[in-house]
C-alpha cells in the first residue's frame, strides 16, 4: 500500500502558471470595471488553473462527510457522549442534518463515509461503509492508529476522489462527524504547525472552562506520549489523527492528483488539509478553504497557512456545512467567468481614460 500512496503523491502536480496571463486577460475583458468582482475573480482564476482548462466545467458537485469515533473520547474531552456519532450518521442518512439541507440547497450530492464509527451500519444508498476499525485508540496513551490503518484510511479517500472524477464530478467538498474530534485535530495542528496548544484549543461542542483545561492537558499528554513517533507527517497523522481526518487527507490528495479542486470545511477538515499539505505542498493549488471557523485557533491556523477563507459566518458545526455554502460561491465565480459577455464580443465601450 505504501507504493500506491507514493504514486499518488508523485501524481500531484503544480498547476500550469503559464495560463495565468490568458485567464487574467479574459477576466479583464468581461463587461465590468477591472477587478470589480473582487475575490470572485481570484476564485475563478484558481479554479481555472486547478482544472487546467481555459473553459472549465462545473457540472456536478459532491460533499463527502467522513465519520469516525475516537478513543480519546474516554478522557472526557467532549460535551457529548460517543454514541452521538452513529446517531448523527443516522440523522444524515434520514436527511435531517444541517449538511443535508445545505448540500441540497447547493445542488450537491452527499455521501456519508463510515471510516471508523463504533457501530455497525446496514447498507444505505447514501452511506459508504469503509470502516478501518471501530474507533481509533486513545492518543493520550499511544498512537491513535497504526501506520497500516493510516495508509488504508488515506487510500480510501484517494479512491473516493478518483471514483468521483470517473462519475463526472468537477468539485468536491469535505465534511466530518466524530465526537471528540476537535481534540486530535488540535493535536495535529500543534505538532504539524508548531502552534501552542493553549492558543488553538477550543470548546468544541460547548465544554466549560474546567473541561477546556482538561482537554488542553490531554492534548499535551498525547504529544508527550507520542513524541518519539512524530518525525514525519505520516507518523504525526497516525499518532494524533483519526480515521475521518486521514480520509479527508486522502480525498484531497486523490482529487489533486487528477486536477480536481476541493472545498475544505472548518476546523476538523482543515486538519486533514494540513496533513495533505505536509505530505505534498502542491495540493495548495487545488484547495479552497470555505470559511473561518468560530472554533478557537482556526484564524491562527489559516494565517500560518497563508490562507484566506471564502466565508466568515461564525460557523463551528462541521459536517461540511461551511463547505457546502462556499461551493456555491465557487460555482458562481466559475459561471461569471464562463458566461459573462466580454468587451470584445459585446457592444459595450471600455474605459475611456
Curated annotation (Swiss-Prot):
One of its GO terms (biological process) is cobalamin biosynthetic process. It catalyses: 5,6-dimethylbenzimidazole + nicotinate beta-D-ribonucleotide = alpha-ribazole 5'-phosphate + nicotinate + H(+). Keywords: Cobalamin biosynthesis, Glycosyltransferase, Transferase. InterPro entries: Nict_dMeBzImd_PRibTrfase, Nict_dMeBzImd_PRibTrfase_bact, Nict_dMeBzImd_PRibTrfase_N, Nict_dMeBzImd_PRibTrfase_sf. SUPFAM superfamilies: Nicotinate mononucleotide:5,6-dimethylbenzimidazole phosphoribosyltransferase (CobT) (SSF52733). It is an enzyme of class 2 (transferase). The active site is at 319 (proton acceptor). Pathway: Nucleoside biosynthesis; alpha-ribazole biosynthesis; alpha-ribazole from 5,6-dimethylbenzimidazole: step 1/2. Its EC number is 2.4.2.21. It holds the Pfam family DBI_PRT. GO terms for molecular function: nicotinate-nucleotide-dimethylbenzimidazole phosphoribosyltransferase activity. Catalyzes the synthesis of alpha-ribazole-5'-phosphate from nicotinate mononucleotide (NAMN) and 5,6-dimethylbenzimidazole (DMB). Belongs to the CobT family. This is Nicotinate-nucleotide--dimethylbenzimidazole phosphoribosyltransferase. It comes from Prosthecochloris aestuarii (strain DSM 271 / SK 413).
Amino acid at each position: 500500500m505504501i507504493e500506491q500512496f507514493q504514486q499518488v503523491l508523485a501524481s500531484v502536480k503544480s498547476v500550469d502558471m503559464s495560463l495565468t496571463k490568458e485567464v487574467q486577460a479574459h477576466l479583464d475583458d468581461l463587461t465590468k470595471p477591472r477587478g470589480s468582482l473582487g475575490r470572485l475573480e481570484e476564485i475563478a482564476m484558481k479554479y481555472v488553473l486547478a482544472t487546467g482548462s481555459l473553459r472549465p466545467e462545473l457540472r456536478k458537485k459532491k460533499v463527502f462527510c467522513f465519520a469516525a469515533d475516537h478513543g480519546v473520547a474516554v478522557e472526557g474531552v467532549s460535551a457529548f457522549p460517543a454514541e452521538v456519532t452513529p446517531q448523527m450518521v443516522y440523522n444524515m442518512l434520514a436527511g435531517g442534518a444541517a449538511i443535508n439541507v445545505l448540500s441540497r440547497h447547493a445542488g450537491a450530492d452527499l455521501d456519508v463515509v463510515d471510516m471508523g464509527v463504533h457501530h455497525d451500519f446496514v447498507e444505505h444508498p447514501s452511506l459508504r461503509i469503509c470502516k478501518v476499525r471501530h474507533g481509533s485508540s486513545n492518543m493520550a496513551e499511544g498512537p491513535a492508529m497504526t501506520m497500516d490503518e493510516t495508509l488504508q484510511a488515506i487510500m480510501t479517500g484517494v479512491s473516493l476522489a478518483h471514483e468521483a472524477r470517473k462519475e463526472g464530478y468537477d468539485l468536491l467538498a469535505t465534511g466530518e462527524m466524530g465526537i471528540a474530534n476537535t481534540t486530535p485535530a488540535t493535536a495535529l495542528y500543534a505538532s504539524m504547525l508548531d502552534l501552542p496548544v493553549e492558543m488553538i484549543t477550543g470548546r468544541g461542542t460547548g465544554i466549560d472552562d474546567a473541561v477546556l483545561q482538561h482537554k488542553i492537558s490531554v492534548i499535551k499528554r498525547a504529544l508527550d506520549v507520542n513524541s518519539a513517533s512524530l518525525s514525519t507527517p505520516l507518523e504525526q497523522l497516525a499518532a494524533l489523527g483519526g480515521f475521518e481526518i486521514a480520509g479527508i487527507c486522502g480525498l484531497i490528495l486523490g482529487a489533486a492528483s487528477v486536477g480536481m479542486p476541493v472545498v475544505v470545511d472548518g476546523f476538523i477538515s482543515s486538519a486533514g488539509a494540513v496533513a495533505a499539505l505536509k505530505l505534498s505542498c502542491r495540493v495548495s493549488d487545488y484547495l479552497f478553504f470555505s470559511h473561518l471557523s468560530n472554533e478557537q485557533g482556526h484564524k491562527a491556523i489559516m494565517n500560518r497557512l497563508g490562507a484566506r477563507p471564502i466565508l466568515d459566518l461564525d460557523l463551528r458545526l462541521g459536517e461540511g456545512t461551511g463547505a457546502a455554502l462556499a461551493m456555491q460561491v465557487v460555482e458562481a465565480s466559475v459561471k461569471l467567468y464562463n458566461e459573462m459577455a466580454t468587451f470584445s464580443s459585446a457592444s459595450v465601450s471600455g474605459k475611456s481614460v
